[in-house]
Every structure is written in C-alpha cells, then in structure tokens.
Amino acid sequence: WFDAMQLEEGLTLNHFNMVQNSDFSVTGTDGKPKAWTVGKNDASYVEVLPLDAPKDEFHAPDCLKHDNTQKIRLAGRYDRTVTYYQQFRHYGKIGDRFTVGGWCSSFAKKNDPDNYIYCRITVQFTSADPVTDKSYWATGGSAVFNAEEGNWQFASAGIVAPNNCTYIRVVLQMNRQMNFADFTGIYLYPEAFGTQYVYDKNGNRKTRKMLYGGQEKSEFDGADNLTKHTAA
C-alpha cells in the first residue's frame, strides 16, 4: 500500500500529519472517533464532545471549526493518569526527529514533572509488538500545556526517537490532575523542529544546525573568547 505521495519543487516539503482523524470528526457506528483508543481502565474519564457548544464558557478559535470537528475531554484524577491515544506502524531509527502539537482547553493544575503532574501530548516509541503486554514504550518528548482557566491554547514540541521503532503512539495525558482538559487538532509531523543548538560547559554556543541542513560552528579560547566561526 502507498499513501501521501508528493512531488514538489523546492528545498522543503509540505507538512504530512501522521495522526489520523486528528480532529475526531470521523466516528464509527458506536459514535467513537476512529483510529483512537481509550487508555486501560480510563473509559469512565473520557468523553467525546462537540467542539463548540452554546453553553461552553470558552469557545474554540475559528481555525479549528470544520465540519463535525469534535474534542476529547479527559477528566483529571488526583491518584492516576488518564490517557487517550493513537498508535500506528512506523519503521524508524534512533534519532529520527518529529514535531508534535495540538490544541487544549484545560482547567488543570500547574505542571510539576517531579511529582508527575501534567497535562500534555506525549509521543512514545516501541520496537516490540504493542498487542502484547511485554512491549515497552519509550518517550521521545512531549508538548506540555500551561495551567489555564479554560482558554484554548496551542502547544508544539520537538520529538526525538529514543530507540529504533516499529510503532509510534501519540498520547493525550492528564496525570494526577484536577478538573478536565479538552483536546483537538492533534498532529505529528515527520520532520525536525526548529534549530538545534549545542553548548559547551561554559554556556558558549559551539554549533547551530538549521532545519534544512546548514550548520555553523564556533571555537573559543580558555577565556571564552570567540576564536573561530565557520558556516556551511
């Protein structure tokens, strides 16, 4: 099978969203969004709702309003994580780069990674068979949303595959949270995110690698004075 074939002139290609049914508009006969899965034992805390209802206190931006667009609401629980995810086959290598992002309207607490409190979109990778309980999912990064009082916000982040993989999982997560969070417009692009910087132990920028291959290098003396700079 072949999909998303493109022929373009230029240095860059257009975005291709690896996430299917990213706005939850396509549903099955059971009314549930296709291609998405409720986390284990999380059914009581996940709802599918219209994107914008007259009674909503905070309305979604116009750019999200398409035919049948819906949102996923995850209820916060103080003692557990609540997830909603999509997984798909992808053969990749360690170090592969992606960009993940989406929209969220939350009444969540401030994120606290040390105590595992967060509201986010996480991308995970496995080289095992995800049908079995033995598959280990390694995290490649997350797009984290700020604590808010309902306003819609957009978040995006760079993702790096931590290992070779045969499957990718994009996960909406509410962990040890309060109230609820609504998600929609989820995407995962198979490309690097922005510009990569490398610094030495003194904070001097040694290299800058651009998204499309260009790279700059800098050298410093013992007093942190720039002695050489090259660009390619």
Predicted region positions:
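Extracellular and organelle-lumenal recognition/adhesion modules and their flexible linkers in secreted
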Residues: 1-200
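Beta-strand elements of repeat-based all-beta scaffolds
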Residues: 97, 107-108, 136, 192-210, ...
